[in-house]
Amino acid sequence: MSLVTVPFYQKRHRHFDQSYRNIQTRYLLDEYASKKRASTQASSQKSLSQRSSSQRASSQTSLGGTICRVCAKRVSTQEDEEQENRSRYQSLVAAYGEAKRQRFLSELAHLEEDVHLARSQARDKLDKYAIQQMMEDKLAWERHTFEERISRAPEILVRLRSHTVWERMSVKLCFTVQGFPTPVVQWYKDGSLICQAAEPGKYRIESNYGVHTLEINRADFDDTATYSAVATNAHGQVSTNAAVVVRRFRGDEEPFRSVGLPIGLPLSSMIPYTHFDVQFLEKFGVTFRREGETVTLKCTMLVTPDLKRVQPRAEWYRDDVLLKESKWTKMFFGEGQASLSFSHLHKDDEGLYTLRIVSRGGVSDHSAFLFVRDADPLVTGAPGAPMDLQCHDANRDYVIVTWKPPNTTTESPVMGYFVDRCEVGTNNWVQCNDAPVKICKYPVTGLFEGRSYIFRVRAVNSAGISRPSRVSDAVAALDPLDLRRLQAVHLEGEKEIAIYQDDLEGDAQVPGPPTGVHASEISRNYVVLSWEPPTPRGKDPLMYFIEKSVVGSGSWQRVNAQTAVRSPRYAVFDLMEGKSYVFRVLSANRHGLSEPSEITSPIQAQDVTVVPSAPGRVLASRNTKTSVVVQWDRPKHEEDLLGYYVDCCVAGTNLWEPCNHKPIGYNRFVVHGLTTGEQYIFRVKAVNAVGMSENSQESDVIKVQAALTVPSHPYGITLLNCDGHSMTLGWKVPKFSGGSPILGYYLDKREVHHKNWHEVNSSPSKPTILTVDGLTEGSLYEFKIAAVNLAGIGEPSDPSEHFKCEAWTMPEPGPAYDLTFCEVRDTSLVMLWKAPVYSGSSPVSGYFVDFREEDAGEWITVNQTTTASRYLKVSDLQQGKTYVFRVRAVNANGVGKPSDTSEPVLVEARPGTKEISAGVDEQGNIYLGFDCQEMTDASQFTWCKSYEEISDDERFKIETVGDHSKLYLKNPDKEDLGTYSVSVSDTDGVSSSFVLDPEELERLMALSNEIKNPTIPLKSELAYEIFDKGRVRFWLQAEHLSPDASYRFIINDREVSDSEIHRIKCDKATGIIEMVMDRFSIENEGTYTVQIHDGKAKSQSSLVLIGDAFKTVLEEAEFQRKEFLRKQGPHFAEYLHWDVTEECEVRLVCKVANTKKETVFKWLKDDVLYETETLPNLERGICELLIPKLSKKDHGEYKATLKDDRGQDVSILEIAGKVYDDMILAMSRVCGKSASPLKVLCTPEGIRLQCFMKYFTDEMKVNWCHKDAKISSSEHMRIGGSEEMAWLQICEPTEKDKGKYTFEIFDGKDNHQRSLDLSGQAFDEAFAEFQQFKAAAFAEKNRGRLIGGLPDVVTIMEGKTLNLTCTVFGNPDPEVIWFKNDQDIQLSEHFSVKVEQAKYVSMTIKGVTSEDSGKYSINIKNKYGGEKIDVTVSVYKHGEKIPDMAPPQQAKPKLIPASASAAGQ
């Protein structure tokens, strides 16, 4: 997705939060207060000084008046005044003392009150603090429990969004993350952690309630990067990233201001060609990226002259095609750098990128390849996305889309492609083809005229569908002939008008037939027909109909009968393979249909273009340390070739990887990104629209190394000695040997001011030191040197300094030479040099080493005392800085001439630096090893001890195979201790060292001794194993035993051999040695040992069985023996155990074995036979006993017995104590999982909450909670249950009983909860229903009713007296009415009714006659209702037989509802 560009005119707005304003306010107030205090102090000091000066003046004046003796009267007057003042002063002092005492007492009282108040407040604070601490401890525990429950890994809710901004604007990246504990967020820029302290004010990072923000202030071009945010907590890590592209505003909207003119003039859009000198300082290299990532190709350069108004032109090319800015690419040029940024890479962007700086002075360019790999597929094994979508032949409703296929190496081949279209301005993608199209071309029809579309393609293989390709450029569905029919008519003067050709043709009614019908595209899936519109065509819109006919059939079939075609193009699908067709086209408008066009020639649906043949011979050649040049012969059949794909494989692995991800059109390709020193093979395949060719033949194996060239020039030519007639010169070897060993050097000389050079040596000189003879004393000479290798003679060095030929006679030594460096690390390096050729008047006794930073002036001496060695390790250097060094030799006469300054050395460890490793090989030889994958054919390993090359063949042996070298120590001892180093020539300073100290040597020698004197490794030591029948097996297992291995068993220092008592055997294939004892008894206590010999190797293992260890083995053996005897008859394979079924029944289960028909199985409880409904089926081997609704009555000892003539066995399980508790918990688990939701049942007593379960007992651990507070059973809230449910009865509920109720049942591990919110409408409805039930119960309790006394049938003889008596109840007393046959009974002597104490009621019928037979009813009713009871009376005559009737029963009452007024009450 492209980045959203922020408009350049958007202004920056800085926001200040509340805390910032508070800080500013506090600062101003503090500053104001300090100034106020200073001014107050100054004014008080000033007034104080004025007051003191005035007092001094007044005292002096007063003193002067007293001393004056002019007037005696004045003196006496003053004495009186003085006396009066003294008495007034004493009274004032007394008053002031009293006032002061009163004030002191008042202040003391206030102080006592303050102390008392302070003590009270302190006591309150201490109490509050104690309570607060208690609450904090409780909350901390609850918080810990809560935090554990809500802990989760980070999850990003809103991801980062990419931005494109102008330079010097601010950009803010935001995202939202949640998680607990709160995730820690770190920001990264291109994988590097962002540090705010490194660039103060540059970055601002904020975090508020899960929203994290990174603000980049005043963004510049270097801030273009991929920014990532990583959120981490204890449960995981998650990240998100976005791209920030910083564009440079070029000032197109703002005119350039002239310095000399008062007005602004716009800069000319034409850049005048001016001569510029362009020098690249930093260049972009070969780049590897993946689809979807961002990248910026950038070059920094020095442009001379640097003119602000006039600049050279920067042009970017991809595969020699000029690029322009688009939504995918952004370009920038200015301020000494040119860049090309990609906001979202696709494989379309892969290619060779070239930056060309064009000016009058010429073209300066730089090229490098950008590789774009496939993004991870949506489905594993799916192919990569197609690329390079192009739209061709766009018309009113038709366009052809073409693309290039993806490369497949490890994926299965591509079977076809799906083409999708999307109307511009929408985001609705529509698949154009139902079945995958086989070739990389598809005609899309059904477009709407005038609308614009974009397209994308997806590849399909057997694994799935690829990611979609990059969308194509928008294409409009328009007729390209419309502009062709537009003509210009010239009028008088320079005027002209534009008219359509249709206006010149006049009014045409029915159009003519189309012309030029032909097949423009033929493939196996479709045929594209093209034609020319009829002439004249008329002004009305034209439509076309296409007809087809099989050759020879004579019948025509209209292809587009339903939808007319508006474009002179049409793709015909569904043609039968192998048959030829002819076509014709008819044009139509609103006036009618034209005649058919001419018939085309026969056309057959087939692939005109075939798959290309495989490319020819593939040749790989060396290029650089990480690249190889691959060339191949073009295929014989290269019709419509799209390009080639190159694959590579590490030799011997058969794991092929693509080298390029977009077809290349030339038959030579440089493969980058290879591993130095690795061996590869290559293959090539050709690609066209139909598919890919077969793979070419594989290339020969090639090792990745730099190409063989001539060596670079030597350098550092130094004069080492001169005797007046000859000079001894030294120099340094070339930095690059060219890939082959240097064979020697050629030296040329000339006198200063001479033009011609003269050859010094006709044959190459091998050493890097040479004496030049035949020189003239006092003359000045200069020299140059060239190196030679197998490729030829390299470039000569620059001429040396001017050396004067005069004899050296100074007593001090000459300069050291050939300064080299190795083991360059982050803070240290090792420096080596060679001794001076000229030693002076006495031998060289030591050396001083000086260093300095490259641009510093003063030299710093490393060693304060001279070193006698010609090497020195320089430490404590600063990483990343560049230093230069020199060496000064010292003899008895002083310090000699310093050596030439070394080349600058960057103190930094090389990436991938390897060190020497110490080890022991399979033969026990100690060695030091070193690997170097960067070596070339000319590279050599040089091993040194104390930095002196090793040449002692008696103590050392060097073996080098490929890029691996080993230094063997033949007879290691203390003389071999020291520092060993290795260096590899013709590399970028690859070297390492290793200090062999006594501890390391001892370790290596111990390992060597173990290999030379081996022991047999054991997989397992001697152990025992007890079998059935009580047999004991002693065994061990060795890693490996040869057929010649021997062994022996020793028991208590006595060897035992294979016998009936001790059966010993050995399986040498598996290494197992064992001894089996059939009878293990008390006599077998002791120590068991096995000794093994196999060639030189030997091993021993012992097992001590004494004391408790022996008793354990003996008891186990006896137990196994008894078990064996038990299993000879019927026995339990699994003893009695229990589980709980889904129906909450306890099931006792045991497994039996070795039974027969006569075997008797019994269940016993407390030694009493336990009867079961069904007998167990012993053939199944499983016996079960179900105990439904377990309770304490089921406590007891349960036994299962087996018995027949072979023996018997018993299994016992006691249900009590912990076993019973565990059963209850298991039942709780089943019931808790199946418990129903809480239900509300209203009763006259209150509201009842019920939870139905499969089984419930009071012994289950259940809790009822109200608002998360546990409820205890009370009169107000009663807790109980039945076998089917648990309930909570809320008696007489009130408003306080509202809230959430929870029922919990604990199963020993988990709490199973059911909750109900009894508040709001739910509580109101339940409370109303409770009131109704309560009123109904009250009415039911107090209504009129019959307590007893009346039968339902009465039989009596005529003439007798019938007395019907009953007892009634009601509150208030009920009204009693008697009826006969539903009619009121008229009281008389015959019928009499009696009521006693308002509850005993009787009716008497005297002299019963047959007319008294019938139904008698009694109504008992008060205001709460009542009952009606019917009694049937049957009268028979005297002498008649008593009728047969059912025995009388209690009469059944019928309810009588209460009156309306009573119901309302």
Swiss-Prot record:
Q: Where in the cell is it found?
A: Cytoplasm, Myofibril, Sarcomere, M line
Q: What gene codes for this chain?
A: MYOM2
An example of a Gene Ontology cellular component annotation for this protein is: M band
Record the organism. Homo sapiens (Human)
Q: Where is the Fibronectin type-III domain?
A: 385-480, 513-608, 614-707, 710-812, 815-912
Primary location class? cytoplasm
Summary of the function given for this chain in its UniProt record:
Major component of the vertebrate myofibrillar M band. Binds myosin, titin, and light meromyosin. This binding is dose dependent.
Is the keyword Nucleus assigned to this protein? no
* Molecular-function GO term, any one: kinase binding
Residue spans of biased composition, Low complexity class: 41-61
Question: Ig-like C2-type domain: which residues?
Answer: 154-245, 266-371, 904-1002, 1130-1211, 1345-1434
Query: What protein name applies here?
Result: Myomesin-2
